[in-house]
């Protein structure tokens, strides 16, 4: 496996916390502590377009494809709805005074993870809050939706994973998963596994069809693992960490294949916060507290 650094995108004035696809096939959005939401084109490196100013730090973005709207999580302020056609804010809803860590869509619902231990369920067409689900005493850091099983999972700073039914939002299972905060929960593309990471620097993989039994527990990094993502062809996955590194793993064996760091590949200088693996030339994108977004070719 060969790793090549393709580009570095600079433009943010502070830590970059999140990156999501813009669904063009060759672009993405980023946001972070400066409150800027920027659109980038992988075909035109480092020419970012400022599409929104949130006014507060942003941990979470989500693009709703059918309505062409982007949901922006304004920490302590609520949700902004951006029309991606003209880049104008169409609606706002002050759903919380807390931080917003994650936004996920399931059918016509938006699931929003908050810093006060609540998941807010909003109706997408009406942009109305439908319910509050109090899950934890501390922050809900991540949400993952499994369409195959009609479930969603949450990871929280109480060290737990909770599995809910998507229809009635009934709690199905609680797993004391990690020894510290859970930072990321992601279902594998086929829906068979749940990947969880956290402050304890462990990557854990759970078998969805075996009542979420543990498959493997890997001490994968030196410090907290912030995110996990999957390659478009489903053969690999990657993790990123507060230890400044990105690691690439084999999906079939869960074995480490490559480490991307500052010494080997001119990687990030501080915590790597989020990953996005694109279908554009199999490029892997990472963002960091160093204000930079790096693009990697994995071959």
PLM regions and their residue ranges:
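Conserved strand-to-loop turn within each blade of WD40 beta-propeller repeats
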Residues: 31-34, 73-76, 113-116, 155-158, ...
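Short loop/turn segments that connect beta-strands within beta-propeller blades
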Residues: 42-45, 83-87, 124-127, 165-169, ...
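Blade-level signature of beta-propeller repeat domains, shared across WD40, Kelch, NHL, RCC1
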Residues: 271-299
């Amino acid at each position: 496996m060969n790793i090549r650094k393709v580009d570095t995108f600079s433009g943010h004035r502070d830590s970059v916390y999140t990156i999501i696809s813009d669904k063009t096939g060759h672009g993405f959005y980023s946001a972070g502590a400066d409150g800027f939401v920027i659109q980038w084109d992988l075909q035109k490196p480092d020419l970012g377009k400022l599409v929104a100013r949130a006014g507060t730090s942003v941990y979470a973005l989500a693009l709703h494809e059918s309505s062409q709207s982007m949901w922006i999580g304004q920490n302590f302020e609520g949700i902004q709805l951006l029309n991606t056609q003209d880049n104008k804010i169409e609606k706002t809803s002050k759903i919380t005074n807390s931080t917003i860590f994650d936004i996920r869509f399931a059918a016509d619902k938006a699931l929003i993870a908050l810093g006060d231990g609540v998941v807010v369920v909003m109706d997408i067409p009406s942009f109305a809050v439908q319910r509050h689900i109090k899950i934890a005493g501390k922050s809900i850091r991540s949400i993952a939706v499994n369409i195959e099983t009609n479930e969603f999972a949450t990871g929280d700073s109480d060290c737990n994973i909770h599995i809910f039914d998507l229809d009635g939002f009934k709690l199905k299972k609680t797993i004391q998963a990690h020894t510290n905060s859970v930072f990321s929960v992601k279902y594998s593309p086929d829906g068979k596994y749940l990947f969880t990471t956290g402050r304890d620097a462990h990557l854990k993989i759970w078998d969805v069809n075996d009542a979420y039994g543990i498959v493997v527990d890997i001490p994968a990094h030196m410090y907290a693992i912030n995110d996990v993502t999957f390659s478009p062809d489903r053969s690999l996955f990657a993790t990123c960490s507060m230890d400044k590194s990105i690691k690439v793993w084999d999906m079939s064996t869960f074995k480490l294949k490559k480490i991307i760091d500052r010494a080997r590949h001119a990687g990030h200088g501080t915590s790597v916060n989020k990953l996005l693996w694109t279908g554009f030339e199999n490029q892997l994108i990472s963002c960091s507290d160093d204000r930079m977004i790096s693009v990697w070719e994995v071959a």
